[in-house]
A protein has these predicted regions:
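Short, structured segments at the rim of ligand-binding sites
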Residues: 1-437
Length: 437
């Protein structure tokens, strides 16, 4: 098992650029299954979840070529559908949540798919009902295979229809869109997710010959087509990594520039950090985070405690609540964090409390942070990363802490962050990757 050994207290300075967006990468890579022609994808993040998905596509016969660092060519002209029946496929899907995004393309193009229980972060009940109901609305039917613990989904013909999603699921919306591009007639999806990841997927599919309108809204219309062709697509910068770097720069930075962040696609991220008192200077498509020894949390107009909560896009992404919470531990003032979309992502705060943070965990969804105003530094400690986002939050805490910390189970961090120790060490951090028993 690998761990990070972090020597805290070192100021970071310099320039850093975000990787490609993980969530978009998983979607658009799966979308290459929709055509037999070559699809080129650029700015692909070199992270565990994406690399495992690429290997899984290769296993089912997709031809993958690495054209350059972070650039790949995909051609799905000889897909081996028999591999879906193998125990190896089920095993790999069970360790990779992104594998669920293969269902829509396989169903749309080939009329069949296998649904194995996907893996990923253990952060509460992440239902697949939205996916199932969407496929059923298009005319698919399901059957459970007990001895393999999977569902098989088939459709002789997909037919477009109107559907109102029970939740604005990002992966559910993406999956339904990818299946519906080949459905006969018109598909209308209301209460669709509209994150930049979905927008990018729709724009790539349109470049491949799909007919999708309503992009960037929660009402998406898809006119079915007979086939799609190749395309050349570039993945957006990862907004979650941008937010993570803002948090690091605010707490332990000595002047950090974050390059090429795609400001128009950051939504409420910048404003939310500013509500915590963090100074952010926008310079074109770059962000400059100056050194800030003190930052003061805003309060509401009536003087009540600031509340920060997540919401479906264009609300604040839930993936940054963990980072924002760590930043608040050294701010001046108090703030209530309300994690509405997942019910166990705040449980990692026990580790921050052990490090000296003043946090009251009200329930699985809410935590109050009373900031130290940098008067009392966090203490170093040993901890384990429960998921990707808590992992990076704990890494930020360890960078600011006095002494040397150890974070175990860093494979969780590797799932979402590319060479994070090397990139932060280039700014002055002291992070060592070590093999431990």
């Amino acid at each position: 098992m690998e761990s990070f050994i972090i020597e805290g207290g070192h100021r970071l300075s310099g320039t850093i650029a975000p990787q490609g967006a993980k969530n978009e990468a998983l979607e658009v890579i799966c979308a290459t299954l929709l055509t037999s022609e070559e699809v080129i994808i650029r700015n692909v993040p070199d992270i565990l979840d994406v690399n495992n998905l690429i290997k899984l596509l290769q296993d089912i016969g997709v031809k993958v070529k690495k054209l350059a660092p972070n650039e790949f060519s995909f051609q799905a002209d000889e897909v081996n559908l028999d591999y879906l029946e193998s125990s190896d496929f089920v095993k790999k899907c069970s360790s990779l949540r992104g594998s669920v995004l293969m269902i829509g393309p396989l169903l749309g193009r080939f009329g069949k798919a296998t649904i194995a229980k996907p893996g990923g972060d253990k952060i509460g009940r992440r239902r697949l009902d939205t996916h199932f109901l969407g496929f059923k609305n298009l005319g698919a039917h399901f059957g459970r295979v007990e001895d393999r613990d999977v569902y098989e989904i088939q459709a002789d013909k997909l037919v477009g229809t109107y559907m109102l999603l029970d939740e604005a699921s990002v992966t559910g919306t993406a999956n339904i869109i990818m299946a519906a591009v080949f459905a006969e007639g018109t598909t209308t999806i209301y209460n669709a997710a509209c994150e930049p990841y979905i927008q990018q997927l729709c724009m790539m599919l349109n470049a491949m010959g799909a007919k999708i309108s309503g992009i960037a809204s929660n009402l998406i219309t898809i006119e079915g087509v007979k086939e799609l062709h190749g395309a050349d697509h570039r993945i957006l910068p990862d907004m979650i990594e941008v937010g993570s770097f803002i948090g690091i720069a605010a707490m332990i930075g000595d002047g950090v520039r974050i390059k090429d962040v795609s400001v128009p696609n950051l939504g409420l991220i910048l404003d939310t950090f500013r509500r915590l008192g963090v100074q952010i200077i926008e310079d074109g498509d770059d962000l400059l985070i100056p050194r800030q020894d003190h930052y003061v949390i805003d309060s509401f107009i009536d003087g009540t405690i600031m509340t920060i909560s997540d919401a479906p896009w264009p609300g604040l992404t839930p993936d940054l609540i963990s980072v924002l919470l760590v930043v608040a531990t050294q701010a001046q003032g108090s703030v209530l964090f309300h994690q509405k979309m997942f019910e166990s992502r705040l449980f990692f705060v026990d580790k921050l409390i052990d490090m000296g943070a003043q946090i009251i965990l009200c329930d699985p969804h809410r935590a109050v942070v009373v900031g130290h105003d940098n008067a009392k530094k966090l203490r170093a400690g040993r901890m384990s990363s429960p998921d990707i986002r808590a992992g990076i939050a704990l890494l930020i805490a360890a960078l600011t802490a006095q002494g040397t910390s150890r974070i175990d189970n860093i494979a969780q961090i590797d799932r979402g962050y590319e060479n994070i120790e090397g990139r932060l060490n280039a700014l002055g951090a002291k992070i060592q990757r070590a093999e431990v028993c």
